[in-house]
A protein has these predicted regions:
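Conserved acidic, metal-coordinating active-site core of Asp-based
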Residues: 1-78, 82, 87
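Hydrophobic/aromatic beta-strand patches that form the interior of the parallel beta-sheet core
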Residues: 76-78, 95, 110-112
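Asp-based, Mg2+/Mn2+-dependent phosphohydrolase catalytic module
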Residues: 90, 98-130
Length: 130
């Protein structure tokens, strides 16, 4: 796709993979131009997600918790990218993975080991769930 006008159907998500500098500039450009229409998340230094305003993992988690009656103290969230941070404020037990960007680690209640070090398993063992 060379121009967004070529798309003739609703767009639920746009994801880009590009050099870190290009991704940084693209995120700023989209936020400046379309901040009232879209959510922009860095999933890692080279990847960007663009979603309709109000769409996020956190918003979806809130809907699921309401629907199923889940208690925020009994739900655990894990993430390593900006797109995961919205979940962290929804629950008591939020974990940034060891490989997460510093910004993500700052927002989580806990930091666990990386994916390759079985970070989710380690965190669940720390809480005597496994």
């Amino acid at each position: 796709i060379k121009d967004l006008s070529e798309i003739q159907y609703p767009v639920n998500k746009i994801q880009t993979i590009e050099d870190e500098e290009v991704t940084t500039q693209l995120a700023l450009d989209i936020q400046n131009e379309f901040k009232d229409q879209y959510e922009v998340f860095r999933t890692c230094p080279r990847e960007l997600e663009v979603l309709p305003k109000g769409y996020s993992k956190g918003a979806t988690l809130v809907r699921m918790m309401d629907m199923f009656g889940w208690d925020k103290d009994k739900v655990f969230t894990f993430g390593d990218g900006e797109n995961d941070v919205s979940m962290f404020g929804v629950v008591t037990h939020s974990f940034a993975m060891g490989q997460a960007m510093d910004y993500v680690k700052e927002k989580a209640a806990h930091v666990t080991k990386s994916n390759v070090e079985q970070g989710i398993v380690a965190a669940l063992k720390d809480f005597n769930i496994l």
